[in-house]
From Swiss-Prot:
Summary of the function given for this chain in its UniProt record: Involved in transcription antitermination. Required for transcription of ribosomal RNA (rRNA) genes. Binds specifically to the boxA antiterminator sequence of the ribosomal RNA (rrn) operons.
Residue segments, region Disordered: 1-24
Protein name as annotated: Transcription antitermination protein NusB
InterPro entries tied to this protein: NusB-like_sf (IPR035926), NusB_fam (IPR011605), NusB_RsmB_TIM44 (IPR006027)
BP GO terms, sorted: DNA-templated transcription termination; transcription antitermination
Gene Ontology molecular functions: RNA binding
Alphabetical UniProt keywords: RNA-binding, Transcription, Transcription antitermination, Transcription regulation
Entry's family note: Belongs to the NusB family.
Pfam families linked: NusB
GO CC annotation terms, alphabetical: cytosol
HAMAP family xrefs: NusB (MF_00073)
Gene3D superfamilies linked: NusB-like (1.10.940.10)
Composition skew (Polar residues), residue ranges: 1-13
Length: 158
């Protein structure tokens, strides 16, 4: 088992994970969180299912596991961070967009190795791909505001 934040290369791979591998890890983690929202299947079962049912050869597996497990483990805390920035009750947020902003909140809080602009951009791109027509605007707004709270030194104008 890996620890949260472990980004060591996967067996058979050398060096740092590629951006595309992390992008795919984020997308799969978001889909796993979405599935969990509806099925209440244990997160370990969802992780195992995704590992079997998807081509993981171009996925940063450690990052996928960190995101999936971390967001699940800290969901209540992440929701408390997000709620002040929401324009509606949490239960009314589209499940895809909710999974994306939870994922982004986790990355902003725990993955300091990922620049806040990357976290926001990746969230926007996932919302465009998987969310509703205007979902990317919602995701952008929430993650931008949250980044100013969690990454003050990084977001402060110079």
């Amino acid at each position: 088992m890996s620890e949260a934040g472990d980004t060591s290369p996967q067996p058979g791979k050398t060096g740092q994970p590629k951006a595309g591998d992390r992008r795919r890890a984020r997308a799969l983690a978001m889909q796993g969180l979405y599935q969990r929202h509806f099925s209440k299947t244990p997160i370990s079962d969802i992780e195992a299912e995704f590992m079997v049912d998807n081509d993981m050869s171009k996925v940063d597996i450690m990052y996928f596991r960190d995101l999936l497990r971390g967001v699940h483990r800290e969901q209540a805390e992440l929701d408390k961070l997000l709620e002040p920035f929401l324009d509606r009750p949490l239960k009314e947020v589209d499940p895809v967009e909710l999974a994306i902003v939870r994922l982004g909140a986790y990355e902003l809080k725990h993955r300091i190795d990922v620049p806040y602009k990357v976290v926001i951009n990746e969230g926007i791109e996932m919302a465009k791909r998987f969310g509703g027509t205007e979902g990317h605007k919602f995701v952008n707004s929430i993650l931008d505001k949250l980044s100013r709270r969690l990454r003050l030194a990084e977001t402060r104008p110079r």
